[in-house]
Structures are given as structure tokens and as C-alpha cells.
Amino acid sequence: MAASSSRRIAAAILAACAAAAGAQERDQLPIQVEARGGTDFDYSNGVFKFYGITITQGAVKITAERAIANGLDIKDSSWEFSGAVHITMPDSALASDTARVRFSAGEISSADVTGAPATFRQERKEEHAEGRANRIDYDLKRGTVVLDGDAWLSDSGKEITGAKLIYSMTNQRVVSEDGPVVITILPGEAPQTAPKPKPQP
């Protein structure tokens, strides 16, 4: 009985260690940088330029026509992207003219994007949310999206417009700042044809 109990405890400890190792591996996924259009490395000034760039870390991907980085250490750094910038995550995406992406502890932590306008989209099981603004600040760790400047957000049959909207992707909560807000409730789709009248008895 004691031996059997000891084996169960040992198995539980091994399973817990394996789960912890798996979580650690996810946090330490490698970041791959590909420059299809070439590079320009100025080592004397620590400026690195990439053309036709794609950065991938697991299911997170960034593509742009150009990128500039002050150093290649992406454990804790900031990169500037410009030209047809697209940032895709497992359940969301951003598109913009320019972007500043921050790397923290070896992973992408946030993205500040600007455009005319910049756009955002989140996919959920049976619906989606999308928005646009002059600037969008996306915090991957907190799961928040700040739409700043002519902000518009569509979610769950509602359209919200305002100067600044803060959207939480985890609980679908919207907070407005810096001025009035207009909310438009969209009706359900009308039937394409009128129902047939019931036959008279």
C-alpha cells in the first residue's frame, strides 16, 4: 500500500514538472527574423535595417516593408516598422502604416500602430470584434486595445464611436475617454421575403 502510494505521488510530481517545463518552453519560443529584401547593418552606430521583413514567434507574426532596430538583442528592445505593417496573433490581427513593437523578456509584449486608419480585429467562437483609429495601442500581456483618434469599434451588434476607446479582449468591456461617445445598435437581419399568410379556415 505504501509503495503504491509513493508511486502515485512520484507520478504526480513528474506530471507537475512536465507541465511546468512545457509552460516554460512556451514562454521561451524562439524568434525568427527573415528579411526577403535584404539588410543594412551599421555596426558602428548600432542601427540595423531590414527590408521585406517577417518576424515570427510561435503563432505571432509581424510583416512589413521596412524595419529599423537599434541592436539585435530582442530580449528587451523596441523595433520600428513601416509600410504595409501586419501583425497577427492566434485570435487577433492589426494592420497599419507604421508600428512600434516592444519585446520584453524575449517575447513580443506590445504594439503601437498608426495609420489612416489603423485597424484591429479579434476573432471569437461565433462572432468577432473589429475597430479602427488613427492610433492603436495593443498590450498583448494585458489583453487590452486602446483606439485613439476617430475611434470606431464594432462588437456584438453594436458600433461605438468616440475620440478614445479602451477595449478589453478578455471580458469584452469598452471604456470611453476624451469626449462624447455615440453607440449604434444594429438590428438583426431582416427576412428576405415576407412570411406567407396562413390559409383561412
Regions found by a protein language model. Name each.
Residues 1-201:
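Mature-chain termini and adjacent capping regions
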